[in-house]
C-alpha cells in the first residue's frame, strides 16, 4: 500500500499575502469549504495574532470545517500561541504551526538571540502549544541559510518536545531541486529521532522551482507538502497544489506515495480562488489553465482523436474540466436556489443576504438562458465584496461610436446622496472610470484592469478585476455583469469601497 502524502493548503494564509489578494472572512470560509470538499488534509486558515480580522477568520473556518484539520500560524511566543489556541478551540481537529528563525543572520540581527536561546525558545513554544493540541508543527524560518549542524540540533529538540511535523521552508525560492531533496535526506539521516515526525516542505517559486523542489523533497522522504491553489502567494507565489497532486497521481510508477485529493474538485477550486482574489489563471497554466488540454497542432489533434493517450497524460474530466453543471433558470424558485448554494458550500449569514443575491440571480436569468455554478460563485463574490457600500452605482450610460470620442455618464450614490458626472475617454471603460473619479476624487492609481468570461457563450457574464493603489495600500475590486462596461464600473467602485472602509480586513495590505 502506498504511503500517504499530506496536502497542507496555505491559500488562506500565505496565498493571501499576494498584494491585493486580501479576502473577507466570508470568502475565506467559502474557500475552506471547497478545500474540504476536495479532501485537503490540513487547511492553514491564518495568523490569529496578526489582527482581529485574522483571528475571527481562523475561528470562522474552524467552525465551518469538520473533516479537514484546521491550522493556525503562531510565532514561537506564548501570547501568539494562546491567541491561536483560542481561535481554534471551537474545533477538535486542529493544529498549531509555530516557527522561529534559525539562520545566523536572523538570529543575530532580527531576534538578537544566541543559538542556545533559540533552541530553548523553540522547545518552550512547542510545549506551550501542546496545551491546546497534540498536533503541533514546527518551522525553522530561513532553513536554507541555516547551518546544518544547528538545524539538526533544533529539529531534534522540538521532536523531543512533542512536534509531530517538521516543516522545512525554502523561503526565498533559491534552492535547486537536487540541493533541496538532499537537504531533506540529510536531515532525516542525521537526526536520531527523525522517525517520530513527518517532514514537510514549503517552497516558494522565485526561480520557478517550487513544484520541482517539493517533488524532489517527496522523493527524499518528505510526506507533507505545503502549497496553494493556483500557486497563489507573495512575489512569484508558492508551490501549486494542483501541480503537486497531479504530478504524484499521474506518475504513480515513480512516486512511493499518493494523496487523498478528489481531483475532480481541482478546477472548481481554481476558479473559486481566482474569482475571489481577482488573480486570473494564465491560459497555459498546467492543469487549470484554459489551454491545458487544448490541441491546435493538426498532428496532435489527429493523434488524440485516434488514441487519447498519444498526447494526453491525464484526462481533463479527472481534474474537473467540463463539470460546470447547468442548473437553474428564470423559473427557478428560492428553495432551489438556496439548495444549490448549499451544495456549492456557500453559506449566507442572513435571509436578507439571500434575498439580495436571489434578486440579482433573477436579473441575470432574464439576461442569459443558462446559469452555471460559476455564475453563482460570481454573484455571491460580487455581493459580498464589502460589508457596507459607501459608493453604489445607480445608473450608467456609455456611448462609443466609430470615429467619435467615447463618453460616459454615471450616477452614484455617495453616502446618502446622489451625484452624477459625465466624462470622455479613450474608450467607454476609460470614460466610465474618469466620470467616477470626477465624483469621488479618490486620487488612486489604477494598477490592473482584467476581464474574464465566467462561462462560455456570447451571453456569458464578464468578470472584471480592478486593482487600485493609494498611499501604499493595494486592493482588488470585482464586478460581474453581462455588460462589460457595467461590470467595470462595479469593480472600480468595489475597490474604492474597500479603500474607504475602516473595517479591518482579514489580512490588511498596508
Curated annotation (Swiss-Prot):
Its EC number is 2.3.3.13. It comes from the Bacteria. GO terms for molecular function: 2-isopropylmalate synthase activity; acetyl-CoA C-acetyltransferase activity; manganese ion binding. Its main location: cytoplasm. It is an enzyme of class 2 (transferase). Residues 392-510 are annotated as: Regulatory domain. GO terms for biological process: L-leucine biosynthetic process. Pfam families: HCS_D2 (PF22617), HMGL-like (PF00682), LeuA_dimer (PF08502). It catalyses: 3-methyl-2-oxobutanoate + acetyl-CoA + H2O = (2S)-2-isopropylmalate + CoA + H(+). Keywords: Amino-acid biosynthesis, Branched-chain amino acid biosynthesis, Cytoplasm, Leucine biosynthesis, Manganese, Metal-binding, Transferase. InterPro entries: 2-IPM_HCS-like (IPR050073), 2-isopropylmalate_synth_dimer (IPR013709), AIPM/Hcit_synth_CS (IPR002034), Aldolase_TIM (IPR013785), LeuA/HCS_post-cat (IPR054691), LeuA_allosteric_dom_sf (IPR036230), LeuA_bact_synth (IPR005671), PYR_CT (IPR000891). Signal peptide: none annotated. PROSITE patterns: AIPM_HOMOCIT_SYNTH_1, AIPM_HOMOCIT_SYNTH_2, PYR_CT. It is found in: Cytoplasm. Pathway: Amino-acid biosynthesis; L-leucine biosynthesis; L-leucine from 3-methyl-2-oxobutanoate: step 1/4. GO terms for cellular component: cytosol. Mn(2+) binds at residues 14, 202, 204, 238. Its cofactor is Mn(2+). Residues 5-267 form the Pyruvate carboxyltransferase domain. Catalyzes the condensation of the acetyl group of acetyl-CoA with 3-methyl-2-oxobutanoate (2-ketoisovalerate) to form 3-carboxy-3-hydroxy-4-methylpentanoate (2-isopropylmalate). Belongs to the alpha-IPM synthase/homocitrate synthase family. LeuA type 1 subfamily. PANTHER family: 2-ISOPROPYLMALATE SYNTHASE 1, CHLOROPLASTIC-RELATED (PTHR10277:SF9), HOMOCITRATE SYNTHASE-RELATED (PTHR10277). Homodimer. This is 2-isopropylmalate synthase. The gene is leuA.
Amino acid at each position: 500500500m502506498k504511503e500517504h502524502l499530506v496536502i497542507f493548503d496555505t491559500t488562506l494564509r500565505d496565498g493571501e499575502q499576494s498584494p491585493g489578494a486580501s479576502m473577507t472572512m466570508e470568502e475565506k470560509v467559502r474557500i475552506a469549504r471547497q478545500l474540504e470538499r476536495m479532501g485537503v488534509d490540513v487547511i492553514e486558515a491564518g495568523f490569529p495574532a496578526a489582527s482581529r480580522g485574522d483571528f475571527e477568520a481562523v475561528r470562522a473556518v474552524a467552525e465551518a470545517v469538520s473533516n479537514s484539520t484546521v491550522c493556525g500560524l503562531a510565532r514561537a511566543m506564548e501570547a501568539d500561541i494562546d491567541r491561536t489556541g483560542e481561535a481554534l478551540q471551537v474545533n477538535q481537529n486542529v493544529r498549531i504551526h509555530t516557527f522561529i528563525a534559525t539562520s545566523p543572520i536572523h538570529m543575530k540581527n532580527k531576534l538578537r538571540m544566541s543559538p542556545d536561546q533559540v533552541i530553548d525558545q523553540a522547545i518552550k513554544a512547542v510545549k506551550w502549544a501542546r496545551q491546546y493540541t497534540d498536533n503541533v508543527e514546527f518551522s525553522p524560518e530561513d532553513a536554507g541559510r541555516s547551518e546544518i549542524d544547528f538545524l539538526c540540533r533544533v529539529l531534534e529538540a522540538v521532536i523531543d518536545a512533542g512536534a509531530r511535523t517538521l516543516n522545512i521552508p525554502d523561503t526565498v525560492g533559491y534552492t535547486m531541486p537536487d540541493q533541496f531533496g538532499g537537504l531533506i535526506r540529510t536531515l532525516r539521516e542525521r537526526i536520531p529521532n527523525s522517525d517520530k515526525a513527518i517532514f514537510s516542505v514549503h517552497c516558494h517559486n522565485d526561480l520557478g522551482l517550487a513544484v520541482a523542489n517539493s517533488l524532489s523533497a517527496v522523493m527524499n522522504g518528505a510526506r507533507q507538502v505545503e502549497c496553494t491553489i493556483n500557486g497563489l502567494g507573495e512575489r512569484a507565489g508558492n508551490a501549486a497544489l494542483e501541480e503537486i497532486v497531479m504530478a504524484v497521481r499521474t506518475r504513480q510508477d515513480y512516486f512511493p506515495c499518493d494523496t487523498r485529493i478528489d481531483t475532480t474538485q481541482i478546477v472548481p477550486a481554481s476558479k473559486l480562488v481566482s474569482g475571489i482574489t481577482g488573480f486570473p489563471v494564465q491560459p497555459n497554466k498546467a492543469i487549470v489553465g484554459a489551454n491545458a488540454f487544448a490541441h491546435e497542432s493538426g498532428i496532435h489533434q489527429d493523434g488524440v482523436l485516434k488514441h487519447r493517450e498519444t498526447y494526453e497524460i491525464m484526462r481533463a474530466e479527472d481534474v474537473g474540466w467540463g463539470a460546470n453543471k447547468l442548473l437553474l433558470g428564470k423559473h427557478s424558485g428560492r428553495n432551489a436556489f438556496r439548495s444549490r448554494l448549499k451544495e456549492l458550500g456557500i453559506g449566507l449569514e442572513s435571509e436578507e443576504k439571500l434575498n439580495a443575491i436571489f434578486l440579482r440571480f433573477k436579473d441575470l436569468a432574464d439576461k442569459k438562458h443558462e446559469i452555471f455554478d460559476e455564475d453563482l460563485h460570481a454573484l455571491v463574490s460580487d455581493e459580498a465584496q464589502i460589508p457596507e457600500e459607501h459608493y453604489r452605482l445607480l445608473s450608467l450610460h456609455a456611448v462609443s461610436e466609430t470615429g467619435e470620442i467615447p463618453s460616459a455618464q454615471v450616477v452614484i450614490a455617495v453616502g446618502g446622496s446622489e451625484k452624477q458626472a459625465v466624462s470622455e475617454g479613450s474608450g467607454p471603460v476609460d470614460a466610465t472610470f474618469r466620470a467616477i473619479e470626477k465624483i469621488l476624487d479618490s486620487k488612486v492609481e489604477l494598477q490592473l484592469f482584467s476581464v474574464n468570461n465566467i462561462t462560455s457563450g456570447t451571453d456569458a457574464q464578464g468578470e472584471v478585476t480592478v486593482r487600485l493603489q493609494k498611499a501604499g495600500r493595494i486592493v482588488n475590486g470585482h464586478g460581474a455583469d453581462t455588460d462589460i462596461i457595467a461590470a467595470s464600473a462595479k469593480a472600480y467602485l468595489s475597490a474604492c469601497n474597500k479603500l474607504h472602509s475602516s473595517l479591518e480586513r482579514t489580512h490588511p495590505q498596508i
